[in-house]
């Protein structure tokens, strides 16, 4: 026992570990293991190779004798075991053979143990209900049989391969029995489910025994639907659509500006103001023309009526009509009507009137001219005709009927200079 905890156990990487984990072994086996580890029991092991370890310990890591050094050496940090580090040198073939044999044994054991546990899969599905009673009765001999195989495998056998093969055959028999048991259990479970009463609280169709199955009558309308009803429904739908469209059109028309009425009103105001506007440029042109005729002493009654329309458009370009009377969208009708109205006004002027009387009447009505200049340029009263009163009355009637337009203001000094130059050039 001292050798287990002594330096001999420390020489082997798994010695201390296995001695601590296997307290259930018999004392004789413990002594044999200690002798194997110390190297003193090698001849005994050669003499009696049939002594085997407990098969339950084969799942642990195999032990290596003292003669065969391990391929791994432990690294110790602070007295504790740490991961093993491989030692230098080639691995021995004996270790490979032993490990392959142990792996084969482990796989065989796991195969038959897994086949034994697979038989209880159905009982695990009924774990919530505690399992079926028939299942427990049938499971009894199978479980005892499996326990017998385990106990027999735990016993020490003389030759290991025969024990392993016997365990394989026993487990194969158990596996052959297991499918039939599962089929029988499934049949029992289906029969038990069929024998269970229905637990639905509210049946789908109320039915009594001995009465035929009657379906409820279908839903019926309170009135009869005819083709007229369908036509009325279509008309009502069309009316709803039309009313919606009319409301939309009305809203769109309300949002649009009232442009046509505005243009008509502007045209009407422009037509009413055209005669008054067109008279002013023609009068200005006639005033200049009559001034030149007064200086020369010539009277041409027909020439004034024929030449003024040609000069009227040019005077119209100089004197722009005021903005509020015309719309910006239609300037061409205003100019054409302006020229036509100027021609009409010039044709309305009486031809036999002398130039001096016309000039005097225009100067009297013109607000821009000064009084001294008008008095200097005015001819003596002896040259006026009898029709001067009628001309003045006609001019006053024109001013009363139409608004007086705002004429282009000529600078005062320039107007006086032009008048003085013209009067000085006239023969005295």
From Swiss-Prot:
Family of this protein: Belongs to the POM121 family.
Organism domain of life: Eukaryota
Entry-linked Pfam families: POM121
Compositional bias ranges of the Polar residues kind: 118-129, 144-155, 260-269, 326-347, 403-415
InterPro entries, sorted: POM121-like_prot_1 (IPR043220)
Protein name: Putative POM121-like protein 1
Bias (Low complexity): 106-117, 416-428
Basic and acidic residues bias: start-end ranges: 44-62
Region (Disordered): 1-23, 36-204, 254-293, 306-384, 402-428
């Amino acid at each position: 026992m001292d050798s287990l905890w002594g330096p001999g156990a420390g020489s082997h990487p798994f010695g201390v570990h296995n001695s601590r984990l296997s307290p259930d072994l018999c004392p004789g086996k413990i002594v044999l293991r200690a002798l194997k580890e110390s190297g003193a029991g090698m001849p005994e092991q050669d003499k009696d190779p049939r002594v085997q370890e407990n098969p339950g310990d084969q799942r642990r890591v195999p032990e290596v004798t003292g003669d065969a050094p391990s391929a791994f050496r432990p690294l110790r940090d602070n007295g504790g075991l740490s991961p093993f580090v491989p030692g230098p040198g080639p691995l021995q073939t004996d270790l490979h053979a032993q490990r392959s044999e142990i792996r084969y044994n482990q796989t065989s054991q796991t195969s038959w143990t897994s086949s034994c546990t697979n038989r209880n899969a159905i009982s695990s599905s009924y774990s919530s209900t505690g399992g079926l009673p028939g299942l427990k009765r049938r499971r009894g001999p199978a479980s005892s049989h499996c326990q017998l195989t385990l106990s027999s495998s735990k016993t020490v056998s003389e030759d290991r391969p025969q024990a392993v093969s016997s365990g394989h055959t026993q487990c194969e028999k158990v596996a052959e029995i297991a499918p039939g048991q599962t089929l029988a259990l499934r049949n029992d479970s289906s029969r038990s489910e069929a024998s269970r009463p229905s637990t639905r609280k509210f049946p789908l169709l109320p039915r009594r025994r001995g009465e035929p199955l009657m379906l409820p009558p279908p839903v019926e309308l309170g009135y009869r639907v005819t083709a007229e009803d369908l036509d009325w429904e279509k008309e009502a739908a069309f009316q709803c659509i039309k009313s919606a469209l009319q409301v939309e059109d009305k809203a769109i028309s309300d949002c649009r500006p009232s442009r046509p009425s505005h243009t008509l009103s502007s045209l009407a105001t422009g037509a009413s103001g055209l005669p008054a506007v067109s008279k002013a440029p023609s009068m200005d042109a006639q005033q200049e023309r009559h001034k030149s005729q007064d200086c020369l002493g010539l009277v041409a009654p027909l020439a004034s009526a024929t030449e003024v329309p040609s000069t009227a458009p040019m005077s119209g370009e100089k004197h722009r009509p005021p903005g509020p009377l015309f719309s910006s969208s239609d300037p061409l009708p205003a100019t054409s009507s302006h020229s036509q109205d100027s021609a009409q006004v010039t044709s309305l002027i009486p031809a036999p009137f002398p130039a001096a009387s016309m000039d005097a009447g225009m100067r009297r009505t013109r607000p821009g001219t000064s009084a001294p200049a008008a008095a200097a340029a005015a001819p003596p009263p002896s040259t006026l005709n009898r029709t001067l009163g009628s001309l003045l009355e006609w001019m006053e009637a024109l001013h009363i009927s139409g608004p007086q337009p705002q004429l282009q203001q000529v600078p005062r000094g320039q107007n006086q200079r032009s008048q003085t130059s013209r009067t000085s050039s006239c023969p005295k």
